[in-house]
A protein has these predicted regions:
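An acidic, glycine-/histidine-flanked metal-binding catalytic module
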Residues: 22-54, 61, 103-120, 130-227
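Feature for intrinsically disordered/low-complexity regulatory segments and propeptides
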Residues: 61-77
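Sec-dependent signal peptide recognition
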Residues: 2-9
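Short, flexible, solvent-exposed loop/turn segments with mixed acidic/basic and small polar residues
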Residues: 74-87
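Amphipathic interfacial helices
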Residues: 86-95
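Helix N-cap motif at beta-to-alpha junctions
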Residues: 97-102
Length: 227
């Protein structure tokens, strides 16, 4: 029933556009408000599970992050979906392990405990032609999914700016990664923005994809520091 309702509203939004807010858009807004409210309700549970997982593997978990109404609406338009179809209105990241080969153990633990609590929704492994890879476990609540990403220390370092990396994993781990790899944090995002830019030529895209692959290769598996 909700699926049919969603399709009708989606067509209305796509056809009329955001500039013509009629009754259909008001219904879309109502669903958005409800989905965002549920994300706030389910967020603390999601964060607690992420922290439990992080503690099991001597890692850390980021504070729960909620999509803004504006960001959620843009994603609905980009993905041609409705608010309840979004799986990351509330999301957090578990940062654990130094070797990418060990991520599977973290994911398996996360799947096990969410299954025991009847909250497991789906597992997705992401890959790309520019070196990025990631693992996502979605929790399924009554009518909305939330998201827990799983990353190694190196992959987290690759994707986020220095301030956030230091705040999340601590200065000691940050300095260790930099001393071992010699690369700056957050460059994966810089390369990605250039790769996806409409103004980038094919040669530019190919060049930065190669830089990105090399960058991720360096950070994929880092020797565990001596305790």
């Amino acid at each position: 029933m909700r699926k049919a309702y969603s399709v009708i509203l989606l067509l209305a939004v796509v056809v009329t556009g955001c500039s013509q807010r009629g009754p259909e858009q008001s219904l879309f807004d109502q669903q958005m408000d409800c989905a965002l409210a549920l994300a706030q309700e389910y967020g603390p549970i999601t964060e607690a599970i992420a922290r439990q997982t992080a503690e099991e593997f001597d890692g850390v978990a980021t504070e729960i992050n909620y999509k803004s109404p504006e960001s959620a609406e843009r994603k609905c338009q980009t993905d041609s979906c409705m608010p309840f179809d979004l799986k990351d209105l509330a999301r957090t990241t578990v940062v654990a392990t130094w070797d990418s080969a060990a991520v599977g153990e973290v994911v398996e633990f996360l799947i096990t405990i969410t299954t025991e609590q009847e909250l497991f929704g789906r597992y997705k492994h992401q890959t790309s032609d520019y070196g990025y890879w990631g693992d996502i476990v979605n929790l399924q609540f009554d009518s909305l999914m939330t998201e827990i990403q799983v990353k190694t220390y190196g992959m987290f370092y690759a994707a986020d700016p220095e301030e956030m990396v230091r705040e999340t994993i601590g200065d000691e781990r940050y300095e260790y990664i930099y001393s071992v790899t010699g690369v700056e944090p957050g460059m994966a995002h810089v390369y990605y923005e250039i790769i996806r830019a409409d103004t980038s030529s094919e040669a530019t895209i190919a060049h930065y994809k190669q830089l990105s692959r090399e960058y991720f290769r360096i950070l994929q598996s880092i020797p565990k520091p001596d305790e």
